[in-house]
Structures are given as C-alpha cells and as structure tokens.
Amino acid sequence: EEALAHRVEMVRLAVRENPHFQLSLHEAKKDCHSYTYKTLQEFHALYPENEYFFILGADSLFSIEQWKYFKEIFPSCTILAAMRDDKDSFDMQRQIQYLETNYQAKIELLQAPLLEISSTTIRNRAAQKRSIRYMVPDSVADYIQKLQLYTKREEERS
C-alpha cells in the first residue's frame, strides 16, 4: 500500500538521527487490527532485554480504561504522557496517581512546550501548501513537499 510506504518512510526520516528511537515494521506487516497490549507482549518476547516506553497524549490517560485489555499495558512499559493542551495539571496528577495506585502503572508526565499539533492539521496545512516547519522534522517536511503528499486530498473532496 502506497500510503503505508509513505508513513514508514516519514517515520524512518524522523527517527534516523536519534539513537534512542528505532523504526519497527512489526505492526505494519500484520493483516489484522493491532492492539497496544499485544504489540508490547510480542516485543517483550522478541527483545526481552529491552526497556519499553509508550508515548501518548496525556489526555489519553482519562480514557485508557476503555482500551482493549488496558490492564496488560501497564506492567509492560513505562507510559510517557505528553501534555497536548493546558488541561489542569491538578486533574492530570490526580489521574496519574489513580492509575498508578489501582493498576501499578508507571507513568511519567513529559514536560515539553505546548504545541497544538495533530496529524490532521499537518495534512491539511500540507494540502493547502502552508508551512509545516516545526511541526515535523525538516527531513519529513522536505519529503512531504517533494512528493506533494496530501495535496490530492483537497482535489478529491472538490
């Protein structure tokens, strides 16, 4: 699938200069729906010596109990929760404490500049030929621009 190939290449470009990240095609090779807990189990079986971190938007901590087999995620990794908005940090700390107490979750809140970035925003800006600089690594922005990815999306809607 062409779209998958582009996503894989953009991730490869984004992580290539950071030795702490590694591109895995594990889920991309599957023909079925993939659940986080299952992927973590499979990684632990393949690479038991590794320590795993799962990065998600901190707002997901409020809905994670609705995820399929969510309890299986907590013992498998440390969750790194990135703040995506200015949600009350008191509520966030209370939710983290709740998950740690009730599910023995290991959760760290990532302190980073608050940037309103979403894949939808990036695709829409690229489709409108607007800058996506600082939203994605330069190598990814160059790739999107060079191949004119997402520009057809607007034409298809018209």
Language-model segments: what does each one mean?
Residues 1-158:
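Nucleotidyltransferase catalytic core that binds NTPs
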